Amino acid sequence: MIAQTPPMGWNSWDCYGAAVDEPTVRQNAAYMAEHLQVFGWEYVVVDIQWYQPTATSHAYEPFAELTMDEYGRLQPAPGRFPSSAGGKGFKPLADYVHSLGLKFGIHIMRGMPRMAAHRHLPILGCGKGCHEVANPNSICAWNPDMYGLRCDMPEARAYYDSIFRMYAEWGVDFVKCDDIAREYPHCKREIEVISDACRACGRDIVLSLSPGPAPLEQAEHLKKYANMWRITDDFWDEWRLLKGMFERAEKWCVHAAPGHWPDADMLPVGALRQCYDQNGWTNFTQAEQRTMMTLWCMMRSPLMIGGELTKNDDFTLKLLTNRDVLAIEKTSACAHPLWTTEDESAWIAPRRDGTGLYVALFNLSEETRTVRVTGEMLEGTYSEASELWTGEKLHLADGVTATLGKHDAAVFWVE
């Protein structure tokens, strides 16, 4: 089974929108291999519109000419990804990423290009044309590129088979499929068809569904057909969004397990929005970034870095390479909140090996606050604790206590 632990990597969206190019992907991959890989970071993911030759930002150019082959399958734009020229697709770039010991991922939109349907291009491996399988009534509300498919037709599966076999030939390890996770009920069958094509392509590919919020009542369906799915709309560097994530995390945490992970979205840390401002930087304070990383790790969300890695400062690099905090993702089980109020939250997660607990304390208020979990709440006798951000060792008398500045967090290994 793939995705036995939450996937960890980098995604180009937060820093480059639709405009990332091959040199940028390569430099981020090289940085990951040198500075992050040893800590568990491994996926390098090219986000939306890699097939659009003139993309420049997070905005979409309406009805732009897209790069695709004779079967209506999108291809990397050679002007942005030079190694793809001559029909090579993403294979040369994926080969480079693999040569670093990393894994390569791409973003796709559900469906097929509208251009492919309008031009009546054939579907590889069957007798139907794209125009016969495309559903013009199934379109994305925020991107103009695609039509959904008539998934009651076997030729819809043939189209998805053709693109996933191509991704497998390229060496793709991760596919983020967009405009689908929150589109229940009308995209339920399309999720199943995409998942089946992904699993039948001959290569292990992690399937991630976006955007959120995915409906909680569809949790079992999502767990059956995807490896991760978004529980929120796009998450950005705003405190109100981070504070709101505590409610979502509480609802979804029980569904986190090997092979399927509720996804709280990317980590907007470091250098963001580079397509607009080369000096762009996260609006989160250092305290808020600790809170975000602590919550994501406690709920065992996938971790995808959103910033331009080569511009990481010392704080950002240390935030992303704290072995003890990152270990929560791989060694804990059954994480859940003890409580969450307007002003504070406390989470607990036993280690799978039974050797102790992780305890996270959060100050959600606008002033310094002391947050305490009593020994009775821990449901056991524990005498020692280590705070994982600072390394401070504590002797416990009755529970765990931390005095935290506004929007800050502490996380303890208790034994």
What is the meaning of each model-derived region?
Residues 291-339:
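Catalytic cores of secreted or luminal carbohydrate-active enzymes
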Residues 290, 296-299, 304-306, 340-379:
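Carbohydrate-binding surface patches
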Residues 13-15, 49-51, 109-113, 180-182, ...:
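Active-site beta-loop-alpha junctions enriched in small/polar residues
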Residues 32-96, 100-168, 172-184:
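Aromatic-lined carbohydrate-binding/catalytic grooves of carbohydrate-active enzymes
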Residues 131-138, 151-152, 158, 162, ...:
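Glycan-recognition surfaces
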Residues 376-391:
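Solvent-exposed beta-hairpin/edge-strand motifs
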Residues 7-12, 42-47, 104-107, 173-178, ...:
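Structural recognition of the beta-strand scaffold that forms the well-ordered cores
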Residues 396-415:
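C-terminal beta-strand-rich structural cap/linker in extracellular carbohydrate-active enzymes
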